UniProtKB/Swiss-Prot annotation:
Catalytic activity: 2 superoxide + 2 H(+) = H2O2 + O2
Keywords recorded for this protein, A-Z: Acetylation, Antioxidant, Copper, Cytoplasm, Disulfide bond, Lipoprotein, Metal-binding, Nucleus, Oxidoreductase, Palmitate, Phosphoprotein, Zinc
Modified residues (N6-acetyllysine): 121, 135
Modifications the protein undergoes after translation, according to the UniProt entry: Palmitoylation helps nuclear targeting and decreases catalytic activity.
Gene Ontology MF: a single term: protein-folding chaperone binding
Name listed for the protein in its UniProt record: Superoxide dismutase [Cu-Zn]
GO biological processes: action potential initiation; anterograde axonal transport; apoptotic process; auditory receptor cell stereocilium organization; determination of adult lifespan; ectopic germ cell programmed cell death; embryo implantation; gene expression
PANTHER family: SUPEROXIDE DISMUTASE CU-ZN -RELATED
Subunit structure, interactors included: Homodimer; non-disulfide-linked. Heterodimer with SOD1. The heterodimer CCS:SOD1 interacts with SLC31A1; this heterotrimer is Cu(1+)-mediated and its maintenance is regulated through SOD1 activation.
Cofactor (UniProt): Cu cation; Zn(2+)
Keyword Metal-binding: yes
Membrane-spanning intervals of the chain: none
């Protein structure tokens, strides 16, 4: 059973980063940094597939094995892959420090082999008042992505 994972984020533009995942009890700690972003919030999600053959688009929708509507990371109604937003500073750097009780590195909610995506816009956490909000949080385009793999 994997207890650690890593993801290298890359895209067509300047956005890049490294994200690490570590299982701690019944939660997963997500840490790392992303550079090349515009200042402000950016949606941050685990997507269904580990397929990046057509860039980040082929990663599919948010990882949602429970068939729920999109929400924030602290919401009862959320996709497993809904990790909310990362916040970039004026230098375009986002420091990631998330503890999530729903994602896992093993079992039915395992994110191993799936794609981590950082988005162009803020995630409205499903509160945008339209259909797209309940699917994607209106987070916009996919700036960078990478497949989550087992780490030593």
């Amino acid at each position: 059973m994997a207890t650690k994972a890593v993801c290298v984020l890359k895209g067509d533009g300047p956005v890049q980063g490294t994200i690490r995942f570590e299982a701690k009890g019944d939660k997963v700690v997500v840490t790392g940094s992303i550079t090349g972003l515009t200042e402000g919030d950016h949606g941050f999600h685990v997507h269904q597939f580990g397929d990046n053959t057509q860039g980040c688009t082929s990663a599919g929708p948010h990882f949602n094995p429970l068939s729920k509507k999109h929400g924030g990371p602290k919401d009862e109604e959320r996709h497993v892959g809904d990790l909310g937003n990362v916040k970039a500073d004026k230098n375009g750097v986002a420091i990631v420090d998330i503890v999530d009780p729903l994602i896992s590195l093993s079992g039915e909610y395992s994110i191993i082999g799936r794609t981590m995506v950082v988005h162009e816009k803020p995630d409205d956490l499903g509160r945008g008042g339209n259909e797209e909000s309940t699917k994607t949080g209106n987070a916009g385009g996919r700036l960078a992505c990478g497949v989550i793999g087992i780490a030593p």
